[in-house]
Amino acid sequence: MSEAEYLGGRLLLAMPGMGDPRFDHAVIAMCVHDEHGALGIGVGHVREGITLHGLLEDVGIDPGLAPDMPVLNGGPVETARGFVLHSDDWGGEGSVTVNGLCCLSASLDILRAIAEGRGPSRFVIALGYAGWGGGQLEGEMRRHGWYAAQGRPEILFETPTGRRWTQAWKREGIDPAHLVGQTGSA
């Protein structure tokens, strides 16, 4: 793939019938994609039983001014590892810009900043990530497992979690009700 074809900063939308129930109606914010592989954070499903306040308390941070919002299921890899996708108005150590979609941070510094009311203005927090080895995601794309939508911050930060998949399709001009789960050949 050429650099222009890599999917960093895009939203991957799971196609109906992709065959992996872990990714049913998944929305993945793609953070890194190159010849060595890809890493994205799932933003379409809530991790049941975990809220931001509980997560902060688990890592020894007083929730303070943090909103008690759901934590998202970021993916099936390293499910105890936390990631914050956020607006670019906070730039602590280790914060990385993801091609205009958002910034990515994975340090306790951002969690402390959020709890103290000095964090980013917009953010989502997830545990785990989705990862692919070199060429693996490209193969899944060829098999119609994923659709690469434009990376729209309003889908990530303003759309309720359970509506992100449908709204991302609609912003692409596609009615997801018309999608089929299988392809055929003539």
Swiss-Prot record:
It comes from the Bacteria. GO terms for cellular component: cytosol. Gene3D superfamilies: VC0467-like (3.40.1740.10). Pfam families: DUF179 (PF02622). Belongs to the UPF0301 (AlgH) family. PANTHER family: UNCHARACTERIZED PROTEIN YQGE, UPF0301 PROTEIN YQGE. This is UPF0301 protein Saro_0683. The lineage of its organism: Bacteria, Pseudomonadati, Pseudomonadota, Alphaproteobacteria, Sphingomonadales.
